[in-house]
Regions:
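Copper-binding active sites and cupredoxin-like electron-transfer domains
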Residues: 2, 15, 26-424
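Hydrophobic helical h-region of N-terminal Sec-dependent signal peptides
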Residues: 11-19
Length: 424
C-alpha cells in the first residue's frame, strides 16, 4: 500500500518534472464548433451562445473536454489516483495543455437538446503522474443509435486521441433519452480508473413549455397544480412530465487497483473487486454534500508548486430535493465494469418510463410504463424513473442499493451507494 506521505512525495516530484518540461512542451489544440467554426472565439474557447445547456437557443451545441489523470477523495478520507475528463469549454486553447490533474469523477455532465448538432472536442493532456504511459483516449457516446463505427472509440475499429492531440466528434441529436459516456480505449482499465460521465438528450417537446409557445397538440404543461420543467420523451400527453430532474450514475472502484496503478505495478484485472461504491463519484455521506468536494491534498500540492489553483475533482452531488406534489425524474445509469446494482427508494412510488434511452411503448404506441419498488442496472444500462410525491409524507427518505455489502466506504459502514431524497 502506498502511504499518504509517499504519495505526496511522488506528487511533488511529478510537479517539479512538469515545471522542467513546461518550456519545451509543444502541442496543438484545435477546437471545432459549427459550420465555418463560427462557434470558436479567437482564443480557441467556445463562444457562450454555443455551449451546451438549456440556455442554448441556436441549432449548434459545442463542448471541449480534456482527458488526463487526477486524484479523488473517498468518503472515509482515502485518496485514490484516477483518470478522467475535465470541461475546458470556456478556456483559451493555449491554456488547455496546462490542465494537469484536472480529471473529474464523475466526468462533467453533458446536457443536450434533441434536433441540434453537437460538436465535442477531446484533447488528450497526458498523465501527469504516469509520464511512462502513452495512452490514447476517446469519448464513447454510449447508446447513441446513429454513431458511425469510426467514432466508437474501440481501438480495433476506430481511432484514439493521442497525447497532445485534439479530435472533434460530431453528432446529430435525433433521439432523446438518458445516455452516458466513457473512454473506450483499454476500456476496462480506463473505466475502472474513472473515465465515466452522465449524458442526456432532452426532447423537442420541451419547446412548448415557455409562456406563449405554440402547443398544437394541447399537451398539458402542468401537473398537480405545478408547471412542469420538462418531459423525458416526446410523449404527446405529458405522461413523462417532471418538475425536478437528477442524473444518478452508479459506480464503484477497487482501491488496490488504483494504488498499484500509481505505484507503476502490474494491474490485477483478474482479481478486480470494487470496495468503494458511489453515486456520481461520491460515497455517502459525501453524496448529500451540496458543494463541490475540496481538492485532495495530492492535487493541491502538485498545482501549488506550479502557482495554479486546485479545483474540485468531484463537483457533482446526488442530493435529491422536491416540494410535495412535484414529480421527480431520476436519470439512472450504471457504467460499472464489475457489478450489477439494484436501487430502491425506501418505499417511495417508482415508475419506470424508459430504458436504454427508449420510451417504454409497444408497437401500437401503448405505454408500457411499470411501477416498481426497485430498479436493477447492469454495466452500460440506463433507466428513467419518475417519483410522484403528491401522496408522500414530507420528510427525508433514503435512495440506496439493496446490495447491502455496497453500503460502505471500504471498511466504514453506513456509507457507499446511498443518498437522500428530501421532500419539503
Amino acid at each position: 500500500m502506498i502511504t499518504k506521505t509517499l504519495r505526496r512525495t511522488l506528487v511533488s516530484l511529478a510537479a517539479l518534472a512538469a515545471l522542467g518540461a513546461a518550456g519545451s512542451a509543444s502541442a496543438a489544440v484545435y477546437v471545432q464548433c459549427g459550420p465555418g467554426n463560427n462557434g470558436v472565439a479567437n482564443d480557441g474557447s467556445i463562444r457562450p451562445a454555443f455551449r451546451t445547456g438549456p440556455s442554448v437557443a441556436g441549432a449548434v451545441e459545442c463542448m471541449h473536454l480534456t482527458a488526463g489523470d487526477g486524484f479523488i477523495s473517498m468518503a472515509d478520507g482515502r485518496t485514490l489516483y484516477s483518470f478522467g475528463f475535465a470541461d475546458v469549454t470556456s478556456k483559451a486553447a493555449n491554456d488547455v495543455m496546462l490542465d494537469s490533474l484536472a480529471a473529474n469523477f464523475a466526468a462533467p455532465t453533458i446536457e443536450l437538446q434533441q434536433g441540434k448538432d453537437f460538436y465535442l472536442t477531446l484533447t488528450n493532456v497526458s498523465m501527469a503522474m504516469r509520464p511512462d504511459l502513452f495512452d490514447p483516449h476517446t469519448v464513447h457516446f454510449h447508446g447513441f443509435p446513429q454513431q458511425p463505427p469510426v467514432f466508437d472509440g474501440m481501438p480495433e475499429g476506430s481511432f484514439g486521441v493521442n497525447m497532445g492531440s485534439s479530435v472533434t466528434y460530431y453528432y446529430k441529436l435525433n433521439d432523446p433519452g438518458t445516455y452516458m459516456y466513457h473512454c473506450h480505449q483499454e476500456a476496462t482499465e480506463h473505466m475502472q480508473m474513472g473515465m465515466l460521465g452522465n449524458l442526456f438528450v432532452k426532447p423537442a417537446q420541451d419547446a412548448i413549455l415557455p409562456n406563449n409557445a405554440p402547443n398544437p397538440l394541447n399537451i398539458p404543461k402542468n401537473l398537480n397544480g405545478k408547471k412542469l420543467a420538462g418531459y423525458v420523451y416526446n410523449d404527446g400527453n405529458a405522461s413523462t412530465g417532471y418538475h425536478k430532474a437528477y442524473p444518478l450514475q452508479l459506480g464503484s472502484m477497487d482501491h488496490v487497483f488504483h494504488e498499484l496503478h500509481l505505484g507503476v505495478q502490474p494491474l490485477p484485472f483478474k482479481d478486480m473487486k470494487d470496495d468503494y461504491p458511489m453515486i456520481n463519484g461520491r460515497g455517502y455521506p459525501d453524496t448529500v454534500n451540496p458543494n463541490p468536494l475540496p481538492a485532495p491534498a495530492e492535487k493541491v500540492d502538485y498545482l501549488t508548486a506550479q502557482n495554479r489553483p486546485a479545483e474540485s475533482s468531484q463537483p457533482v452531488n446526488s442530493l435529491i430535493t422536491a416540494t410535495k406534489g412535484e414529480r421527480v425524474l431520476l436519470r439512472m445509469t450504471n457504467l460499472n465494469v464489475t457489478n450489477y446494482y439494484t436501487i430502491t427508494a425506501q418505499g417511495l412510488p417508482m415508475q419506470v418510463v424508459g430504458m436504454g434511452a427508449r420510451q417504454l411503448k409497444g408497437p401500437t404506441g401503448t405505454e408500457l410504463y411499470y411501477e416498481t419498488a426497485s430498479v436493477t442496472l447492469g454495466g452500460g444500462e440506463s433507466a428513467e424513473v419518475l417519483i410522484d410525491t403528491s401522496q408522500v409524507a414530507v420528510g427525508t427518505y433514503f435512495l440506496y442499493t439493496t446490495n447491502l455489502n455496497f453500503l460502505s466506504n471500504f471498511e466504514q459502514d453506513n456509507g457507499g451507494m446511498m443518498t437522500e431524497i428530501v421532500i419539503n
